[in-house]
Design a protein with these regions (language model features):
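N-terminal targeting leaders characterized by basic, low-complexity, disordered sequences
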Residues: 1-5
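Short, membrane-interfacial amphipathic segments enriched in basic
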Residues: 10-22
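Aromatic- and glycine-rich beta-strand/loop motifs that create alpha-glucan
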Residues: 23-30
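Hydrophobic membrane-insertion alpha-helices, especially the h-region
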Residues: 33-52
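Alpha-helical transmembrane signal-anchor/signal-peptide segments
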Residues: 55-67
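Acidic, glycine-anchored loop motifs typical of Ca2+
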Residues: 77-80, 95-126, 130, 183
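Extracytoplasmic "Venus flytrap"/periplasmic binding protein-like
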Residues: 120-122, 129-194
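Bilobed periplasmic-binding protein/Venus flytrap-like ligand-binding cleft at the lobe interface
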Residues: 196-248
Length: 248
């Protein structure tokens, strides 16, 4: 009778929630933002995992830091300068992981010297990209502390900024990598060789056309702290590639 009176008074559309629904609503009320944050974290983990699984393994890393950019843009349908330079490096690099292809990470940094900045500022219709230079300078400083990019091509300005002292330098002595009796190489110091004196420069038009003659060829010191187990292999590959470039 009581139930009938309720139906007459309030109608028959009254819905009684199940205990499970009530618990879910209560949970959502108190833990809504926790749940959203957890879901976001799960999505990030899944996306990063997929990217890591699909990312192509790198066989060799090369660093280039200079005020002379190597364009990645095609001009009149031609192969971009960046791709042409990488194609040259491909001749010296081995397929480290044995997957049938060579994947070279050629990372470039735009770093101007004070003289180059002054020259650009005094040239009509030209301006210095300070934002790019600032971000690249920060990235380069961080990169010099990592053992992935051992083989480096740098401007004289960058070299002087990071060379340090003979007792504490980011670069390793380079004289031991040249063929014995080779007197054609021009050493900027015990740690650097002028690019235009190397077979790499002389025998490859793509290098001559896109990298300044006074670029310096260097190799970083071997890292022993904060590096992966494959660090020894990476350094050995960098040494082998350097020898090939100097003795072609």
């Amino acid at each position: 009778m009581e139930e009938n009176r309720n139906e007459e008074q309030y109608g028959s559309d009254i819905k009684i929630k199940s205990p499970l629904t009530a618990k879910l609503e209560n949970f959502w009320y108190y833990y809504k933002w926790h749940s959203i944050a957890a879901l976001f974290l799960v999505i990030c983990i899944v996306v990063c995992s997929l990217q890591m699984c699909t990312k192509e393994a790198v066989d060799f890393n090369i660093m280039y830091a200079s005020g002379s950019e190597i364009s990645r843009k095609s001009v009149d349908g031609d192969t971009p300068a960046y791709n042409r330079v990488v194609s040259v490096f491909d001749k010296y690099v081995e397929d480290a992981d044995g997957d049938g292809s060579k994947n070279i990470a050629f990372t470039t940094y735009f770093i101007l010297s004070p003289d180059e900045i002054k020259e650009i500022e005094n040239t009509p219709d030209k301006e210095v990209n300070y934002a790019l230079m600032s971000s690249d300078t920060d990235a380069l400083s961080a990169r010099f502390g990592v053992g992935d990019y051992y083989l480096c091509f740098v401007s004289e300005y960058v070299y002087e900024q990071y060379r340090g002292t003979d007792d504490l330098s980011v670069f390793a002595p380079i004289r031991g990598y040249a063929p014995k009796g080779d007197n054609e190489l021009e050493y900027y110091s015990d740690y650097a060789i002028r690019l235009d004196s190397t077979p790499l420069y002389k025998n490859n038009p793509a290098i001559r056309e896109n990298m300044p003659a006074d670029t310096l060829v260097t190799i970083q010191i071997k890292r022993v702290v904060g590096v992966g187990k494959d660090n020894d292999e990476k350094y050995a590959r960098a040494e082998e590639v350097l020898r090939k470039m100097l003795s072609e």
